[in-house]
């Protein structure tokens, strides 16, 4: 099943593919990103997840000023997890964040301080609440499923279960 893409999604993707460095200038303003059609494959879900990762502020009123920018931007996952999570990043406060490549393979994860097992979904909820200061997507919502698909795609080829060694 072919799913049409909105021009606001297609144009930045084409610019990013054709012109290195153009992606940041061409991205749509952050806000609420809502899936407009059902997806029929994990690749489509991951593509939607990438858009949510880059553009959804989850209702947060927080802003940040990227390096070399003249104005502030709404907080999104991409505010801290640069290059779509494919590179190491920092929070606006300066804390180091590792790349998200392989991150999905590290879940579930035991958090000793909380004596709890965190699933990937629970970690996303934590990041949206504590990092973005927004309202996280519901656990079985299309947005959560798409975010998990995106992070899982970034983990393709990673060995699962390394946290149990």
Residue ranges and their predicted role:
Residues 1-4:
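Positively charged n-region of N-terminal signal peptides that target proteins for export
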Residues 6-7, 39:
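Generic hydrophobic-segment detector
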Residues 7-8, 23, 86:
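Intrinsically disordered, low-complexity segments enriched in polar/charged small residues
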Residues 8-18:
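Bacterial N-terminal signal peptides
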Residues 19-25:
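Sec/Tat signal peptide C-region and signal peptidase I cleavage site
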Residues 26-44, 57-165:
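Electron-transfer interface patches adjacent to heme c in soluble/periplasmic c-type cytochromes
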């Amino acid at each position: 099943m072919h799913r049409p893409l909105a021009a606001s999604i297609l144009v930045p993707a084409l610019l990013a593919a054709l012109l290195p460095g153009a992606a940041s200038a061409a991205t749509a303003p952050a806000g609420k990103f809502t899936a407009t059609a059902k997806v029929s494959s994990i690749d489509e879900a991951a593509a939607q997840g990438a858009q949510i990762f880059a553009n959804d502020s989850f209702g947060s009123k927080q802003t940040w000023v990227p390096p070399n920018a003249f104005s502030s931007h709404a907080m999104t996952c991409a505010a801290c997890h640069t290059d779509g999570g494919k590179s190491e990043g920092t929070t606006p406060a300066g804390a180091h964040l590792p790349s998200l490549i392989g991150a999905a393979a590290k879940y579930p994860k035991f958090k000793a301080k909380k004596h709890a097992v965190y699933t990937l979904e629970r970690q996303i909820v934590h990041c949206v609440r504590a990092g973005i200061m927004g309202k996280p997507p519901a656990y079985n919502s299309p947005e959560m499923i798409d975010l998990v698909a995106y992070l899982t795609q970034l983990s393709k080829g990673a060995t699962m279960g390394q946290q149990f060694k």
